[in-house]
Amino acid sequence: MNNIWWQTKGQGNVHLVLLHGWGLNAEVWRCIDEELSSHFTLHLVDLPGFGRSQGFGALSLADMAEAVLQQAPDKAIWLGWSLGGLVASQIALTHPERVQALVTVASSPCFSARDDWPGIKPDVLAGFQQQLSDDFQRTVERFLALQTMGTETARQDARALKKTVLALPMPEVDVLNGGLEILKTVDLRQPLQNVPMPFLRLYGYLDGLVPRKVVPMLDKLWPRSKSYIFAKAAHAPFISHPVEFCHLLVALKQRV
């Protein structure tokens, strides 16, 4: 039986589901889960194939979203970080009646660089896929180091991410590859133009994976959404700026 690992804490009248990024697991939220569970009923999830949600293999974005929805509350704010942002966005597109608000963190509707679009160069993603089969622990560590580069607390933030990864069994190589395939191929720029719920996009100014140039482009493409840039954060603003991060979510709660 393939089970999604799911933990619920807090007693808030609004549910908040947190979806982590590639290679990680729900332990990444431990820096903010106490604070958030005093305002929300908080749901911590290991995405299929990651952390404690074992036995899935590589999934498409649509299948990943459906697997996560099985155990989800009827209505919630869905927050997704990085790859998790694509999963949360997919749920908002296919089941809008279950999403009170959509929050994406250091995420892009199209992670891969295109002619007219800043992002991760496709050969970099392909390189990660190649290196995974050679030395996958080192490849994951390199990817984590990329996420915190440039911040004042880069070293300790990278340590926090590494600790999260090492706390639980590593995902299977095919699961990690499948996640990179989603980052390489998915493009939700047009579909997300029409999501009906409040939509908040959070970014780090120093992010090396989601260039800040996408922010004004998406402001224009999705005029109903709101964006916020953490001036001194990279790819994990909730680790480097936990207080500011939680304030934004509590403020959003008033709008749903």
Swiss-Prot record:
Substrate binds at residues 22, 82-83, 143-147, 235. One of its GO terms (cellular component) is cytoplasm. SUPFAM superfamilies: alpha/beta-Hydrolases (SSF53474). It is found in: Cytoplasm. It catalyses: 6-carboxyhexanoyl-[ACP] methyl ester + H2O = 6-carboxyhexanoyl-[ACP] + methanol + H(+). The active site is at residues 82, 207, 235. Residues 15-242 form the AB hydrolase-1 domain. This is Pimeloyl-[acyl-carrier protein] methyl ester esterase. It comes from Shigella boydii serotype 18 (strain CDC 3083-94 / BS512).
